[in-house]
Amino acid sequence: MSKNIKLTSLTKNSGCAAKIGPGVLHSVLSSLPKFEDENLIVGFDTSDDACVYKINDDTVVIKTVDFFPPMVDDPYTFGQVAAANALSDVYAMGGNPSIAMNLICFPSCLDISIMREILAGGYDKVKEAGAVIAGGHTIADPTPKYGLCVSGFARPEEILSNSNAKIGDVIILTKPLGIGIMNTAAKAELIGENKIKEVTSIMSTLNKYAKECTSGLEIHSCTDVTGFGLIGHGYEMASGSKKTIEIFSEYVPIIDGALDYAKMGIIPEGMYNNLDYLKDKFVVEANISQELQDVLIDPQTSGGLLLSLPEKHAKEFLSRIEKFTPYAKIIGQVLDKGDKPIVIK
């Protein structure tokens, strides 16, 4: 057993870049029969972030599960990022997480103290969210993986979906893109410690604070940007809402250095899976570089919220979130349904 093995050396794909591609996933899920239950408010019909089940007229439960292999070598940080990523789905649905359970796969070649550090990172992030951890499940596995099964609660009218964007809405993204590319560069030892800290800080920031900034505002649609990239999750919102979303590429926040690494070809395998599925679902109308297109489809790990809301409420949201992050920006608008669900300007 070793304390010195790099966690990222034990996995081929890191973080949300390890997700099964959206095309394969869609082909499998679309072939399965659907459960019919009048209390199931949100299932997987529109690829939403979590399921929502009605408990009574005043309460719904939001359920989600998310886990993945490490994208960083520090065990504690890995635990924090994985927990923040799992908790995010509840925030994206308009709820607050209440209870979580650990899911951990752990190899015998690693010292057990590393497992403790991973779990400690998850514990601290769940505590920050105001939720509790009440058990979990472990599996012996050559590839380490960690995440959470999370339950949250909300009132029925508080639920947000990824399928209710309105014509005239603006689109806000709360975290910068390029996380998958930067993690790939870090695994190749191409970036320094300060940049790694910057990227891990972005990943480990809870979307709790962005969600709290929506209080009292008219939010029509919401999702979080994770493994399918901005274009992928934007497509799910546009398709589910039966609208077209226009993205203004020059306003999209991007981590410094991500475009340079993309130009060098330092991109995660998951990006190719995303592109294979999404290539006929968006159109580029601007003269933008290939590396910028790559960043727009880059798989994000614990990415930001993508919000669709009226412009007047967007301005208030941006003024509120300034104290939490410098990255939140208006990056697009919602149009009537056109030839393509996503248009890149």
Swiss-Prot record:
Its EC number is 2.7.9.3. InterPro entries: PurM-like_C_dom, PurM-like_C_sf, PurM-like_N, PurM-like_N_sf, SelD_I, SPS/SelD. Its cofactor is Mg(2+). CDD domains: SelD (cd02195). It comes from the Bacteria. Keywords: ATP-binding, Kinase, Magnesium, Metal-binding, Nucleotide-binding, Selenium, Transferase. One of its GO terms (molecular function) is ATP binding. It catalyses: hydrogenselenide + ATP + H2O = selenophosphate + AMP + phosphate + 2 H(+). Transmembrane segments: none annotated. Mg(2+) binds at residues 49, 89, 224. ATP binds at residues 19, 46-48, 66, 89, 136-138. GO terms for biological process: selenocysteine biosynthetic process. It holds the Pfam family AIRS. The active site is at 16. Binds 1 Mg(2+) ion per monomer. The record marks 19 as: Important for catalytic activity. GO terms for cellular component: cytoplasm. Homodimer. Belongs to the selenophosphate synthase 1 family. Class I subfamily. Synthesizes selenophosphate from selenide and ATP. This is Selenide, water dikinase. It comes from Clostridium botulinum (strain Alaska E43 / Type E3). The gene is selD.
